[in-house]
Amino acid sequence: MHRVEQPYPVPAVTITLFCLLLTAMAVSAVILLSVDDAVYLKQLIEDGGPVQLVGQTAIFAAFAVACVFALVDSKRTSDYLHLSYLLMFYALREADYHYKVSEHAKATQFKRFFSHELIPLYTKLFLATIVILFLVVMYRYLKKQKPVFIAALKARLPWALMALAWGGVFFLSQLVDQVPMFHDVTGQVFEEIFESSAEVLVLTAMILFRLQIRHSRASDPGRVDYSGASIS
């Protein structure tokens, strides 16, 4: 009979982490919206500013963690390789790396990149190759991890709850970015806060996942996890 995996850390710690993140988001919003100097505010929330720096540091750290465990965790090497590619794409996208492939990219959004008449065809093909590979990897990764994630959510494992929270916060960031009524300074502030918070949640979820594995290994070395891999 399959034994239900016990959440680690305990729920109180998970709740505390959520509260800390929500507090940081709220405090950041209050501080940024209280800035009267529009030029200074843009410096705070745009490229190179502290808000984006926090998020980009977190997502590149998450990418580095995935690469490390792709090398040291032999039972999950394939999973971590897929995840590391997804995180690399995520990190480069959030860092607006596509702006660097063409002098005209800065003037257009990513979704309109491929229809921009001044961007060379070879540049579009180069980026299209990366995007197609990203979609293939994402499909394979999500197809394999879906039952694992659902089982972890049912067990209320902290890493799964953080991953679910990431989905919600990431959705909010995209909603603010796409809805015209939010296209003002206030909307931009919340968009950047949501984006950075989502990236912090990714790193937090990955750390909690490793803590869960370590705890499960110590409490029951012979147990098989939700993905079918032995914990030990």
Language-model features, listed with the residues they occupy:
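Membrane-proximal helix-loop-helix units in multi-pass membrane proteins
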Residues: 95-151
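Interfacial helix-loop-helix junctions of multi-pass membrane proteins
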Residues: 102-106, 176-191
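Short aromatic-rich membrane-water interface segments that cap or initiate transmembrane helices
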Residues: 45-54, 110-126, 188-196
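Membrane-helix boundary/juxtamembrane motif in polytopic membrane proteins
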Residues: 142-167
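Juxtamembrane "helix-exit" motif on the non-cytosolic side of transmembrane helices
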Residues: 32-42, 174-184
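Hydrophobic cores of alpha-helical transmembrane segments in multi-pass inner/ER membrane proteins
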Residues: 24-25, 55-68, 123-140, 195-213
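Hydrophobic alpha-helical membrane-insertion segments
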Residues: 81-93, 161-166
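Alpha-helical transmembrane segments
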Residues: 12-32, 163-168
